[in-house]
From Swiss-Prot:
Domain ACT: 4-77
Protein name, as recorded: UPF0237 protein SP_0238
Family: Belongs to the UPF0237 family.
Phylogenetic classification of the source organism: Bacteria, Bacillati, Bacillota, Bacilli, Lactobacillales
Entries under InterPro entries matching the protein: ACT-like_dom_sf, ACT_dom, UPF0237/GcvR_regulator, UPF0237_ACT
Recorded superkingdom: Bacteria
PROSITE patterns: ACT
Description of how the protein assembles with itself and partners: Homodimer.
Pfam families tied to this protein: ACT_6 (PF13740)
Length: 88
């Protein structure tokens, strides 16, 4: 399983640490990561994977709830969606 995680919110310390900790807690591996601050807003994109099958509804709910604790918006999408778009 491969997925794309995006994080957007007002910049503050601890966002990368918190999100990467949650990724590890959920049994996902960070394959690639990019983050920047645009004006005063933090943005991050990570490609994550797992050898095990993952329930995207569960992951989506977990990241949404966790994002609220950091005051950021966290989304997760299957990488298969993006791969399918390029195969049409």
């Amino acid at each position: 399983m491969k997925a794309i995680i995006t994080v957007v919110g007002k910049d503050k310390s601890g966002i990368v640490a918190g999100v990467s900790g949650k990724i590890a807690e959920l049994g996902l591996n960070i394959d690639d990561i990019s983050q920047t601050v645009l004006d005063e807003y933090f943005t991050m994109m990570a490609v994550v994977s797992s050898d095990e099958k993952q329930d995207f509804t569960y992951l989506r709910n977990e990241f949404e709830a966790f994002g609220q604790t950091l005051n950021v918006k966290i989304n997760i999408q299957s990488a298969a969606i993006f791969e399918a778009m390029y195969n049409i």
